[in-house]
């Protein structure tokens, strides 16, 4: 019986406690003039994630999206959304936890953020905006590689100065 209890404690657990919109901003700095011009936008998406420990095994993950649409040289709209979630995560190694917070949780939050951006753009009376899916696993792997390269460079610099 004690063996079963130990196995249950080591079993990874992942629960979504809450998904919510933390911050929203939508600006059309050049309206109404922007509506009078031919619509040929250049859309740029910037995204960022951050996480914070709220309690033992409870984390907040925030996915920030900034979408800028320029029509020629003028900004047509600027949309910023911070989509957040509170996640209870237990039984993972440090590396697995980092991956969950940096890739898995943002992957859960992205559809909510994408829907919010699309809704705001529509309310601004701009044509429908469909954001392409994001490969958060690849972005997280790139982030880990950059950190490792930075640590190696710092170690080499330290050795050279010693």
Curated annotation (Swiss-Prot):
UniProt similarity note: Belongs to the SecB family.
Pfam family, one: SecB
Coiled coil stretches, renumbered: none
Record localization: Cytoplasm
Gene responsible for this protein: secB
GO annotations of cellular component type: cytoplasm
A GO biological-process term: protein tetramerization
Originating organism: Shewanella sediminis (strain HAW-EB3)
GO molecular function terms noted in the UniProt entry: unfolded protein binding
Name of this protein: Protein-export protein SecB
UniProt entry tagged with the keyword Protein transport: yes
UniProt function note: One of the proteins required for the normal export of preproteins out of the cell cytoplasm. It is a molecular chaperone that binds to a subset of precursor proteins, maintaining them in a translocation-competent state. It also specifically binds to its receptor SecA.
InterPro entries: SecB, SecB-like_sf
Protein's UniProt keywords contain Transmembrane helix: no
Major localization class: cytoplasm
Record note on quaternary structure: Homotetramer, a dimer of dimers. One homotetramer interacts with 1 SecA dimer.
């Amino acid at each position: 019986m004690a063996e079963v209890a130990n196995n249950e404690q080591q079993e990874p657990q992942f629960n979504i406690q809450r998904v919510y919109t933390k911050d929203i901003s939508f600006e059309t700095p050049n309206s109404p003039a922007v509506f009078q011009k031919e619509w040929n936008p250049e859309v740029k998406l910037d995204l960022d994630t951050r996480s914070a420990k709220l309690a033992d095994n409870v984390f907040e993950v925030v996915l920030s999206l900034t979408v800028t649409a320029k029509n020629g040289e003028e900004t047509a709209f600027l949309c910023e959304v911070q989509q957040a979630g509170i996640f209870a995560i237990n039984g993972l190694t440090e590396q697995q936890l980092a991956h969950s917070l940096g890739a898995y949780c943002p992957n859960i939050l992205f559809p909510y953020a994408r829907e919010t951006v699309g809704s705001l753009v529509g309310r601004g009376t701009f044509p429908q905006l469909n954001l392409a899916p994001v490969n958060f696993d690849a972005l997280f792997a790139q982030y880990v590689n950059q950190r490792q390269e930075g640590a190696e460079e710092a170690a080499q610099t330290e050795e050279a100065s010693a």
